[in-house]
């Protein structure tokens, strides 16, 4: 199968956020974790698990907070470069939504390597890299797994 004939969206059971676990089910899964604090925390948790927001925010000193998020999803378009750009912009936008500025991101990639050419994965990552570059955000590695369904996104750390 040539890369030009592959429709990435055919490999996803739902596009993008349509693959999310429904809110009520997710709340049930998270119920035992909410409110479970840490002893001797490294900073003051301003936005956390019990807030259900776009990202976590931890104040580390007066006037300085760390914003952290992770976001990934299945293909929403067929072009791998565009999908990478969309997924990266979506991940970075979570930091912006919390009033922060993205500083560093790492890739999160699930790829069916026996089904889809790795050249397509490289295009997805290139799209993500280009969005990070335009945003002034470092891209510093990431994590990948062999997965029957393609998934891509980023974990992003910012400051506010």
Features from the language model and the residues they span:
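N-terminal glycine-rich phosphate/pyrophosphate-binding loops that anchor nucleotide-derived ligands
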Residues: 2-97, 140
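Glycine-rich anion-binding loops of enzyme active sites
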Residues: 62-76, 85, 101-160
């Amino acid at each position: 199968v040539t890369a030009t004939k592959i429709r990435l969206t055919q490999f996803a059971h739902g596009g993008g956020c349509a693959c999310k676990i429904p809110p009520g089910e997710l709340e049930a899964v998270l119920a035992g974790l909410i409110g479970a604090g840490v002893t001797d925390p490294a900073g003051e948790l301003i936005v956390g698990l019990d807030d259900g927001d776009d990202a976590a925010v931890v104040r580390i000193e007066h006037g300085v907070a760390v914003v952290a998020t992770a976001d990934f999803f299945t293909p929403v378009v067929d072009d791998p470069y565009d999908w990478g750009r969309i997924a990266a912009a979506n991940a970075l936008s979570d930091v912006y939504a919390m009033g922060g500025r993205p500083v560093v991101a790492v890739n999160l990639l699930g790829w069916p390597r026996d089904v889809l050419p790795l050249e397509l994965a490289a295009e997805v990552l290139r799209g993500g890299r280009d969005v990070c570059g335009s945003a002034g955000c470092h891209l510093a590695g990431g994590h990948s797994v062999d997965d029957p369904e393609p998934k891509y996104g980023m974990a992003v750390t910012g400051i506010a």
